[in-house]
């Protein structure tokens, strides 16, 4: 990923945890980064499952580990980075539905129920799981707690690794 993206920060987290110095090479998206990996211009890539899984299944790359808490059913033979010797390594990409603060709480509750219904729909869940996506529903409070935790973890990495954004 580009400078300061979640994928870049994943690499910096690995650098920090293992006291190594991987060189970050910024790309404008996953496609050119994967082309560089396949062409052996780079030797390592952090990518999200949605863009990587087709290339992995096609034999154009090898997954060394999943940066999530648990293995992904779509590529269950790939261990987590925690299992591979990076204890506690977790750097997943999260997507959330958010609204401005002015939206009334009853409206937020209706939206939250609708999103959770979609997340828990068996057909939808099966379709996205095939691409390595793990769906997690919850409450707005749960989301805010998660975001605060991620912000704290990566703010620390940004400071310690002196990450700059262009």
Which sequence ranges carry the predicted segments?
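Conserved, function-defining micro-sites of small-solute handling proteins
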Residues: 1-166
